[in-house]
Amino acid sequence: MDCSICTTMPSILRPPRNTICGSCYEGARTTIALLKKLEGSKEDRHDKSNHNSTINNGSSISSSPLFSCEPQPLEKVIKWMKNMKETEEEQKKRIVFLSSFVSGFKEQLHADILLKPGDDGPPIPAHRALLASKSEIFKNILDSDGCKTAPEYAITLQELNSEQLQALLEFLYTGTLASDKLEKNVYALFIAADKYMIHYLQELCEQYMLSSLDISSVLNVLDVSDLGSSKTLKEACVGFVVRNMDDVVFSDKYEPFSQKNQHLCVEITRAFLMETRSKRRD
């Protein structure tokens, strides 16, 4: 079929030269649908903002036509894509600007507190303001009278060794962590993130553990999830064990795990029996 969009030589098309093939048609529909979906989510947030403004100010803000969910022409998609490109470039500049603070950590510029690992490793200089802004628990610790009056004050994180503490601080300063460091320290970082209420790090560790869950790791992850407060992670692990009962229970890791975590074994047994009962009913 003649297509005025994907052909490389539009001059050879037969009149009226405005037909498109099925692939281009579906592509255009999908693109416009995506734009409407994104603008719909923006409109929801905009409406919530208007509602809050009405409550606080006694007046409402009219809805912007930019967020209209009415059918839009394909040409608006091009404008949206250009705006997204500009937004992406702006975000890159912002990341570069914010990452300059990392040099303060690496070069120990004007550090005003020490963090000590639990393995008697050397203390690591850090900045109180950053710790307090990233963790409500750190903020409460730093607000204590003893910590305020002692510039050389050191906080000991007993649950982390030197390498794990370094990884934690690297994440706090940069908002990211190399995949090899995350893989090696994910369990310790998850527990620390839960303890010190560093929610973004906790979510990152949880997503990594869920994405890499397998026979060899599920018991370790289940153990860690029980120490933390992630119900989602714990339920995912129990469900994985139930679906792979033979492989997990007869593995070398299960006996020491069962001796250490009898309550988790009870949960696994109950979940397995409920799953078996459900299958029998079906």
Curated annotation (Swiss-Prot):
Residues in BTB domain copies: 111-181
Biased composition (Basic and acidic residues): 40-50
Pathway membership, UniProt: Protein modification; protein ubiquitination
A Pfam family that the UniProt record links to this protein: BTB
GO BP, sorted A to Z: protein ubiquitination
PROSITE patterns in UniProt: BTB (PS50097)
Biased composition (Low complexity): 51-64
SUPFAM superfamilies: POZ domain
Keyword DNA-binding assigned: no
Database matches in InterPro entries: At1g01640-like, BTB/POZ_dom, SKP1/BTB/POZ_sf
Keyword annotations from UniProtKB, A to Z: Ubl conjugation pathway
Region feature (Disordered): 40-66
UniProt domain comment: The BTB/POZ domain mediates the interaction with some component of ubiquitin ligase complexes.
Function: May act as a substrate-specific adapter of an E3 ubiquitin-protein ligase complex (CUL3-RBX1-BTB) which mediates the ubiquitination and subsequent proteasomal degradation of target proteins.
Protein name, as recorded: BTB/POZ domain-containing protein At3g56230
Organism field: Arabidopsis thaliana (Mouse-ear cress)
